[in-house]
Amino acid sequence: MGRIIRVTGPLVVADDMKGAKMYEVVRVGEMGLIGEIIRLEGDKAVIQVYEETAGIRPGEPVEGTGASLSVELGPGLLTAMYDGIQRPLEVLRELSGDFIARGLTAPALPRDKKWHFTPKVKVGDKVVGGDILGVVPETGIIEHRVLVPPWVEGEIVEIVEEGDYTIEEVIAKVKKPNGEIEELKMYHRWPVRVKRPYKRKLPPEVPLITGQRTIDTFFSQAKGGTAAIPGPFGSGKTVTQHQLAKWSDAQVVVYIGCGERGNEMTDVLEEFPKLKDPKTGKPLMERTVLIANTSNMPVAAREASIYTGITIAEYFRDMGYDVALMADSTSRWAEALREISGRLEEMPGEEGYPAYLASKIAEFYERAGRVITLGSDERIGSVSVIGAVSPPGGDFSEPVVQNTLRVVKVFWALDADLARRRHFPAINWLRSYSLYIDSIQDWWHKNVDPEWRAMRDRAMELLQKEAELQEIVRIVGPDALPDREKAVLIVARMLREDYLQQDAFDEVDTYCPPKKQVTMMRVILNFYERTMEAVDRGVPVDEIAKLPVREKIGRMKFEPEIEKVAALIDETNAQFEELFKKYGA
């Protein structure tokens, strides 16, 4: 027990805190607000409070809980919506109405709900941390694998029969090597600032297929990879994040709304239950965990929400699932660090951010990865992290963007210019990059098309050539260009408008499978080759631009059947042959 001696915003200083530990959770004041000790000096503790501190005064008590900030991991996480410190918002609403009262807590996982548990081990089996004790069908899409906590190993001396149990009931007893008996329930707690252990990391060789053509073809994300989406306001960060949350081929999605508008979380809540998972036909919400920490919630909890989210993601990874984590936006998290650092009177670094900003960002992103999980069987799981960054005024030289780019391997640069021209996703193909292309090309060649890399590089060259020609056109106008270069402009425009542009609100175009992406690319590149051949044979460029097949190529993105898209190649060839006859070429 201690007493408050000073309150500054979300920061409270208390004395008489003998026996307190770093990162211990405490209850502050008469209301019992939740806080966390972030600095100890003698018997004084500096506490960051995760709730509004108005009305708290010196002299009020501070009570330690003896535990660090932890999350509950077990059945009931999926479809749930939490705040930054894993309080279930639906339950809090029942307790206090639409606005959360202060000092409220509720268990993160439902205590009274019964889950159907099927054991996978028997008495006498030797188990280690990470082994699967049994399974629970948590939603129609995901089977929840109940794991032995990482710190437990020994022999099973008792395991329950198949049946319905709450998460508080003991389902197994393990005799440890020292003879102690450890009781296991369906859930366990894990401190959020500690990364969950695994056997070893694997190289990122499998792409995370998102169904967004720009991303999959040009700037691919790998399973277990890290990506950043920086962009100015209104350039489509949140919609891109939503698209990735909807369509990426991860089995579980953790969506952290960190310091963004409340309406954006409402969007997710309204859309996801209606949307069907393309693989199973069940609502997408059944594979999603939402962490809502909107801009009008206390600043300190933003910092916690990022860690809460990644810990939940690591837990599903340990079951052997591929998890995608969306953090929207890491800038707001960095601003929370800046505010708390300022209250602590630390030396500011660049633009007032704390000097340790770079290491905090790196610490978060390095928890991503594709790994062989703990346990006797060789399960492979992955956490792919995609962080949005909102630099003020779209300035990419700002510290959060620069420190993020040092650690992530994929950079999707959103461009306000493209967004103004209604080119979505507004990913600038000249500034963006992916360092995973070399490691994932084998997957594409084996599973989709052996010519994928060659076609991708060819298309990229065309887009870069177009950018060079655009500068000349601005100075001397398009008529001064030779025919071959005019042809490049025509085909590059087709690439931009018919391939890169995608409609997130169209039923067909919102998700483009890899096979269709490659076929569309082949149609456009075939048109390019025939165009060059025609120009060399003396066919005027204006005639090529008027070919009726161009309109069909423009509409192919809305065509669900891949065969019909592939048929455009023959149609293109036939129309060019007619041109050759007409011009006697």
Swiss-Prot record:
Major localization listed first in the record, in broad terms: membrane
Example of a GO biological process term: proton motive force-driven plasma membrane ATP synthesis
Keywords (A to Z) from UniProt: ATP synthesis, ATP-binding, Cell membrane, Hydrogen ion transport, Ion transport, Membrane, Nucleotide-binding, Translocase, Transport
Binding-site residues, ATP: 231-238
Reactions accelerated catalytically: ATP + H2O + 4 H(+)(in) = ADP + phosphate + 5 H(+)(out)
Subcellular location: Cell membrane
Membrane topology according to the record: Peripheral membrane protein
SUPFAM superfamilies, per database record: C-terminal domain of alpha and beta subunits of F1 ATP synthase, N-terminal domain of alpha and beta subunits of F1 ATP synthase, P-loop containing nucleoside triphosphate hydrolases
GO cellular component, one term: proton-transporting two-sector ATPase complex, catalytic domain
Quaternary context: Has multiple subunits with at least A(3), B(3), C, D, E, F, H, I and proteolipid K(x).
HAMAP family in the cross-refs: ATP_synth_A_arch (MF_00309)
Function according to Swiss-Prot or TrEMBL: Component of the A-type ATP synthase that produces ATP from ADP in the presence of a proton gradient across the membrane. The A chain is the catalytic subunit.
Name of the protein in its database record: A-type ATP synthase subunit A
Naturally occurring in which organism (per UniProt): Thermococcus onnurineus (strain NA1)
